[in-house]
C-alpha cells in the first residue's frame, strides 16, 4: 500500500512538465530559440548597474553641504554689529551739553547785585 502511494505523486509531476515543454516547442522550433538568448542578456546588465551608482552618490553630497554653511554664517555677523554702534552714540552728546550752560549763568548775576547797593546807603544817612 505504501509503495503504491509513493509512485502516484512521482508520476504526476513528470507528466505535467512533459506536456508544457512539448507544446511551445512543437509549432515553431527554430524561432523561439533565437530570441530567447538575446533577450535575457541585454536587460540584465544595464538594470543593476544604473540604479546602484547614482542613488547613493547624489543625496549624500548636497544634503550635508548646504545647511552647514549658510546657517552659522548669517546670524553671527549682522546681530552684534548693528546694535552696538547707534545706541551709545546718541544719548551721550545732547544731554550734558544743554543743561550746564543756561542754568548757572542767569541765576548768579542779578541776585548779588541789587540787594548790596540800596541797603548800606539808607542806614548811614539817618
UniProtKB/Swiss-Prot annotation:
Domain of life: Eukaryota
Modified residues (N-acetylserine): 2
Name of a matching Pfam family: Cornifin
Subcellular location, record wording: Cytoplasm
Region spans: 2 X 12 AA approximate repeats: 3-29
GO biological process, one term: keratinization
Sequence repeat start-end pairs: 3-14, 18-29, 31-38, 39-46, 47-54, 55-62, 63-70, 71-78, 79-86, 87-94, 95-102, 103-110, 111-118
Residues covered by region (11 X 8 AA approximate tandem repeats): 31-122
One CC-aspect GO term: cytoplasm
Region (Disordered): 20-43, 104-126
Record bears the keyword Repeat: yes
The keyword Hydrolase appears for this protein: no
Summary of the tissues where the protein is detected: Suprabasal layers of squamous-differentiated tissues such as epidermis, esophagus, tongue and trachea.
Primary localisation category: cytoplasm
Keywords (A to Z) from UniProt: Acetylation, Cytoplasm, Keratinization, Repeat
Induction comment from the UniProt entry of this chain: During squamous differentiation of epidermal keratinocytes. This induction is repressed by retinoids.
Function recorded in the entry: Cross-linked envelope protein of keratinocytes. It is a keratinocyte protein that first appears in the cell cytosol, but ultimately becomes cross-linked to membrane proteins by transglutaminase. All that results in the formation of an insoluble envelope beneath the plasma membrane.
Family membership noted in the UniProt record: Belongs to the cornifin (SPRR) family.
Descriptive protein name: Cornifin alpha
Species this chain originates from: Oryctolagus cuniculus
Amino acid at each position: 500500500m505504501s509503495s503504491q502511494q509513493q509512485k502516484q505523486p512521482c508520476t504526476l509531476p513528470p507528466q505535467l512538465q512533459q506536456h508544457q515543454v512539448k507544446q511551445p516547442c512543437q509549432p515553431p522550433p527554430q524561432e523561439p530559440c533565437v530570441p530567447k538568448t538575446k533577450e535575457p542578456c541585454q536587460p540584465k546588465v544595464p538594470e543593476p548597474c544604473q540604479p546602484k551608482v547614482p542613488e547613493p552618490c547624489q543625496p549624500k553630497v548636497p544634503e550635508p553641504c548646504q545647511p552647514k554653511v549658510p546657517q552659522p554664517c548669517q546670524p553671527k555677523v549682522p546681530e552684534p554689529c548693528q546694535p552696538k554702534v547707534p545706541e551709545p552714540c546718541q544719548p551721550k552728546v545732547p544731554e550734558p551739553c544743554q543743561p550746564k550752560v543756561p542754568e548757572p549763568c542767569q541765576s548768579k548775576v542779578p541776585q548779588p547785585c541789587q540787594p548790596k547797593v540800596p541797603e548800606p546807603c539808607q542806614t548811614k544817612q539817618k
